Amino acid sequence: MKKYRSIWVLIISMFFMASAYTMLIPFLPLYLLELGVSQARVHLWTGLVFSSAFFVAGIMGPVWGKMADTRGKKRMAVRAAFLIGCSYFLGGIVHNEWQLLGMRIFQGFANGLVAASMAIISSTVEEKALGTYLGFAQTSIILGGICGPFMGGGLSHLIGMRDSFFVAALFLWLVTAAIVIFVREPAHAPWKKSQEGSIADDLRYARSNRLMFELLMAYFVLQGTIMMIQPVVTLYIGELQHSMSNVAVTAGTIMSCGGIAGALTTTFWGRLGQKKGYYRAICMTISGAGLGMLIQSIPDSIFWFGVCQAMVSCFIVGVNPSLNAALVKCTPESFRGRAFGLSNTAQQMGSMIGPLLSAGIMEFMPIYMVYILAGIVLLYLAWRMYQAHLHSVSL
């Protein structure tokens, strides 16, 4: 029973982590305006502030993953939760855009809570239940994503965005305490000197493992397209309602409703992957999300944009559980922490590239072109994963 207690504590912890993230990060463009950045330069600073954290997190991912395998996954989860809480606290005391940039760089250094938690869960549950529990973990993140924008929009209206950062810090420090007290890492074989190697060796192994490399590329492309969209949502909604008045509340409501739709379908995709194969689930979910993003470029009203957001959410929530389960199946247990560390690096690098691409697109084209490009990229990724599926029927 203790192992299941550990799993559920981690799943609940990911809910609070996601809540803290989505109650603040999507609204950073508004915080930049509050800090005095001009409307003309907010696109540039949005791209820099978003991407800086992901660049640093991408560099640190293999380091934290290796330390998870050598020094303990729980220790890495505690480290990440505590330091992320510190980064949010720093976000509440910044006074200009340069200080906010420094806060995001530190946040990128602290990153790794989800990767460490997923590594613990995948090492704890039986393989036959892997898809289900990874689906539960993804559902928890989605539910946090639902509550976060509601809380972020409400808190920014009631106490302002600055004080909202302190609330987020409290969330992460409570998560730290819960992991320390309740989570038990499963016993594993002692680390052998023969298993030691450099991070370059880990990267070479990932490149030589064809299935793992394909999955890492999928993490990268998927996250890049998601993060092309995230920084522009509030600005796009402001265009659709022809005003930036109360845009935080409107955007929070739409993103949360989309999250509710996604939460209802996550476990379905996890079970489909277990029964029909994870590659099949990956192809179906990425295709549906790509079509949905293309359609999102069409609406000229808030209502229909929200409907399209719900459609995208229903599909995109099913991608990561299947990617995570497939990653577990194609890597040995002794490499599990590093595998999730590398997947975290791929996601963070995608997260870094995405906002920069969207910022560049908006310099020369309307915002809706970001949605068109993201949809095309996802459809191409789905086709590539289908080609990989033809040679990897075991997954």
Regions found by a protein language model. Give the residues of each.
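Juxtamembrane intracellular "pre-TM" segments in multi-pass secondary transporters
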Residues: M1-Y4, E185-M217
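Short amphipathic helix-loop junctions that connect adjacent transmembrane helices
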Residues: F27-H43, V232-V249
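Central cavity-lining transmembrane alpha-helices of secondary-active solute carriers
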Residues: L48-W64, S256-T265
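Conserved MFS/SLC helix-loop-helix module at the cytosolic interface between two early adjacent transmembrane helices
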Residues: G58-H95, G273-K276
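Structural signature of the two symmetry-related core transmembrane helices
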Residues: R75-L90, A169, R280-I295, G375
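Paired small-residue
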Residues: S87, W98-F106, G292, F303-M311
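Cytoplasmic helix-loop-helix junction between adjacent transmembrane helices
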Residues: M103-I141
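Intracellular juxtamembrane helix-capping segments at the cytosolic ends
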Residues: L113-V125, G318-T331
